[in-house]
Swiss-Prot record:
One of the primary rRNA binding proteins, it binds directly to 16S rRNA central domain where it helps coordinate assembly of the platform of the 30S subunit. Coiled coil: none annotated. One of its GO terms (molecular function) is structural constituent of ribosome. Gene3D superfamilies: 3.30.1370.30, 3.30.1490.10. Keywords: Ribonucleoprotein, Ribosomal protein, RNA-binding, rRNA-binding. One of its GO terms (cellular component) is ribonucleoprotein complex. One of its GO terms (biological process) is translation. NCBIfam families: PRK00136.1. This is Small ribosomal subunit protein uS8.
Length: 131
C-alpha cells in the first residue's frame, strides 16, 4: 500500500516518539524529509539525523532533543496537504507563536524556514510549523 502523505507520516512518527520519550525515531528516507530534518536541526528542534541503509530501503534516523525531561518540540503541525496545497508569497509568510516557532517552506531555492524565505524575498509551499 502506498502512503498518501509521507511528510505527515514523518511528523506523526516524531510526535508519537516524543510522547513516549524515545531518544530516536526511524522514518523511511527521501530527499525532502532529509531537507526538513536538516532545517529542524539547524533551528535546534532535533539533535541530529542520519540516512542509513542502501538505495531502496534507506531510513532517516532522527535523534530527538529534550530539555528538563520535556520535548523541545511542543507542537508539530502539517500545513500544506496533498488535498489542499498552501502556497504563499514572501509578503504573506506566516509567523508561528509571534516568532517563537518556525514554518518550514519548500521554495525554488530549497527547503528553508519562513524567516529565511522572507529575507530572501521568495515564496513557496508551507510544509509545516514547529514550536
Amino acid at each position: 500500500m502506498s502512503m498518501s502523505d509521507p511528510i505527515a507520516d514523518m511528523l506523526t512518527r516524531i510526535r508519537n516518539a516524543q510522547m513516549v520519550e524515545k531518544k530516536e525515531v526511524n522514518v523511511p528516507a527521501s530527499n525532502l524529509k532529509s531537507a526538513i530534518a536538516s532545517v529542524m536541526q539547524e533551528e535546534g528542534y532535533i539533535k541530529s539525523f542520519s540516512v542509513d541503509g542502501i538505495a531502496a530501503s534507506k531510513t532517516l534516523n532522527i535523534k530527538l532533543k529534550y530539555y528538563d525531561n520535556k520535548s523541545v518540540i511542543e507542537k508539530l503541525k502539517r500545513i500544506s496537504k496533498p488535498s489542499l496545497r498552501v502556497y504563499v508569497s514572501s509578503s504573506q509568510m506566516p509567523s508561528v507563536m509571534n516568532g517563537l516557532g518556525i514554518v518550514i517552506v519548500s521554495t525554488p531555492k530549497g527547503v528553508m524556514t519562513g524567516q529565511t524565505a522572507y529575507e530572501q524575498n521568495i515564496g513557496g509551499e508551507v510544509l509545516c510549523s514547529v514550536y
